[in-house]
Amino acid sequence: MTQIELIQQRLGESIAVKQQLLEDKQLMQTLARLADAIARCLNAGGKLVICGNGGSASDALHFAGEIVGRFQKERRAWPAVVLNADVASMTAIANDYGYAEVFARQAEAHLKPEDMFIGISTSGNSENVYRALLKAKELGAWTACLVGRDGGRIGRESDYPIIVPCQVTARVQECHITIIHILCEMVENMLTNPERDE
């Protein structure tokens, strides 16, 4: 395979997965419901608490950056906490309790019932994200996830599971960042134009 053929193949694969999402009516409905829930959470004074590992950790940071800063519209800052950003807490918890607890322990510290927990995991089975999700549910917070494959344990336990049904991590991550941008646009539209007819 030539370099050009590789480029064409990977772009084609990425388009194909996104086309699959575009045709998934249930996903569209869940995504719209999640955007509405995020808007209600933020409007009521709640915050987003987000986490992931590796590339998903970067997606969590990106998501929070769009929420705290802005996506496209000039508006007030909204609160978002990224659990994988706090290196001191993560390493302290990993040292004392093990890596599986690095997010759950922080979730216990940060989450309140009016908040929303969003876990990002391409497999849907990351143990530390799963434990944080369970802690969020225990605390009465709303739960959502961006996952891949069949959704895994995280997808099954979330109030708002956004599942990219693909086995290839890179393709799932490409869809996740697109979904994050769509969510940010929808939330900004709802909170800056609250009377707009959806």
Task: Locate each region found by the language model.
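A short, well-structured juxtamembrane/interface segment
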Residues: E23-A44
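Conserved hydrophobic/aromatic pocket- or pore-lining residues that grip, position, or stack substrates
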Residues: I38, G52, I67
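Short, structured helix-loop boundary elements
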Residues: I4, M28-L31, A80, A100
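Glycine/serine-rich anion-binding loops at beta->alpha junctions
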Residues: K47-F63
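Structured helix-beta-strand junction loops
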Residues: V17, A44-G45, E157
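Generic N-terminal amphipathic, Lys/Arg-enriched alpha-helix
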Residues: M1-Q26
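Glycine-rich phosphate-binding loops that contact phosphosugars or nucleotide phosphates
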Residues: L61-D197
